[in-house]
């Protein structure tokens, strides 16, 4: 049975924006990638955004799973209730697919909807097997201490852009292709530097008091 990673996207298209390089890297090495879509936007958008997410999953080779009903995570919604739903429903999905890794936005990703999903996954970890790993990504806010870096090339980026382009309705609103390519360019320089800095041990205490 193939090992499984569950990615929890706060909105459709973030499976193609958050950390698509790492997900595709696992997919290419035999992992099953379960793409959980937590919300579908405003009611009048839901049919379109679900269809776009299904097409993106087809392009990526991911298994799409939609929370039902979709989360309401706009400003003014009951974000505490949405957090509880994530904390309850993610373990059920992890158990169904026997996942080894859960991936989500950081609980500190600045965007309120991203943080709802991140906090919900964080709470769910208390009920999940101790051997399961939780990976976080940051888009709206940088991770404070990143410890995983996956380098990829232009062909990989073109593949990610092809997946993202399934979201034509969202790209008309805001061209996230520029964000995906720009983050890749920036992290080609900063990524390994930030991971190596985070991995350094703290300085040893001074053997003698210093004032």
Stretches found by the model and what they are:
Residues 1-132, 165, 182-186:
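Active-site beta-strand->loop->alpha-helix modules in alpha/beta enzyme cores, enriched
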Residues 1-3, 52, 56-64, 77-81, ...:
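The feature marks non-catalytic terminal segments
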């Amino acid at each position: 049975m193939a090992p499984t990673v569950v990615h929890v996207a706060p909105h459709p298209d973030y499976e193609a924006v958050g950390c698509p390089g790492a997900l595709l890297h696992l997919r290419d090495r035999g992992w099953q990638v379960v793409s959980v879509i937590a919300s579908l936007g405003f009611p009048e958008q839901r049919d379109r955004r679900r269809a776009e997410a299904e097409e993106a999953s087809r392009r990526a080779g991911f298994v799409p799973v939609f929370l039902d009903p979709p989360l309401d995570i706009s400003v003014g919604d009951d974000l505490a209730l949405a957090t509880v739903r994530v904390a309850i429903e993610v373990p059920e999905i992890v158990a169904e697919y026997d996942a080894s890794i859960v991936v989500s936005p950081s609980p500190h990703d600045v965007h309120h909807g991203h943080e709802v999903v991140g906090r919900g996954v964080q709470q769910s970890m208390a009920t999940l097997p101790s051997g399961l790993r939780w990976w976080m990504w940051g888009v709206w806010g940088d991770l404070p201490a990143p410890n995983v870096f996956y380098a990829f090339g232009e062909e990989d980026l073109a593949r990610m852009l092809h997946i993202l382009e399934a979201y034509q309705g969202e790209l008309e609103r805001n061209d996230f292709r520029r964000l995906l390519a720009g983050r890749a360019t920036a992290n080609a320089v900063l990524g390994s530097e930030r991971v190596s800095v985070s991995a350094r041990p703290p300085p040893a205490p001074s053997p003698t008091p210093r004032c």
